[in-house]
Design a protein with these regions (language model features):
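Oxyanion-binding and handling regions
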Residues: 1-40, 88-128
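Short glycine-rich anion-binding loops that position phosphate/pyrophosphate groups of nucleotides
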Residues: 11, 64-65
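Short, residue-level hotspots on alpha-helical faces of the histone-fold
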Residues: 40, 44, 79-80
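Phosphate/pyrophosphate-binding loops at sites that engage ATP/ADP/AMP, CoA/4′-phosphopantetheine
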Residues: 42-58
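DPxDG-like acidic metal-binding loop motif
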Residues: 58-63, 69-87
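Phosphate-handling active-site elements
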Residues: 50-54, 82-94
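Short, active-site-adjacent cap segments at secondary-structure transitions
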Residues: 67-68, 98
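Short acidic/glycine-rich loop or secondary-structure boundary segments that cap or lie
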Residues: 14, 68-69
Length: 128
């Protein structure tokens, strides 16, 4: 199972891909120029780790709370990938994980299953 995790809700854009049992991560500044090329950052990240969007089984995206622009852009990309590539996605918030402490990004797929996060449902949490 190959999982992609995207978090653009904070001051960094965080990407993680779990390929079998291997975990690869990177981060970028959360800036307007990076929002405009987020899909390029994702594609380059996957290529660097010898995979592609076609090999991703599930995508997990942080729905907030956090940056409106970051959440909006990451959700738009994930929704587009769902429509064009038929990749299921899960919109999580660290608030969903019921006081689980020290949550690592690689734990997100297991926690989404544990807390029954619904697939292909977008309910963003924006900070005012």
């Amino acid at each position: 199972m190959n999982n992609l995790i995207i978090d653009a809700a904070t001051d960094k854009i965080f990407l993680s891909v779990i390929i079998d049992k291997n975990i690869y991560t990177c981060s970028h500044e959360n800036s307007k120029s990076n929002f405009e090329k987020l899909i390029i950052l994702i594609t380059d990240f996957l290529n660097k780790n010898k995979t592609s969007i076609n090999k991703i089984d599930k995508i997990y995206v942080n729905r907030g709370p956090g940056s409106f622009a970051g959440i909006r852009n990451s959700l738009s990309i994930v929704k587009g990938l769902f429509l064009t590539q038929k990749i299921d996605y899960y919109c999580f918030s660290f608030l969903d994980f019921d006081k689980s402490t020290n949550v690592k990004y690689e734990d997100v797929p297991i926690l989404c299953d544990k807390f029954k996060i619904k697939k292909n449902l977008i309910k963003p949490l924006y900070l005012s």
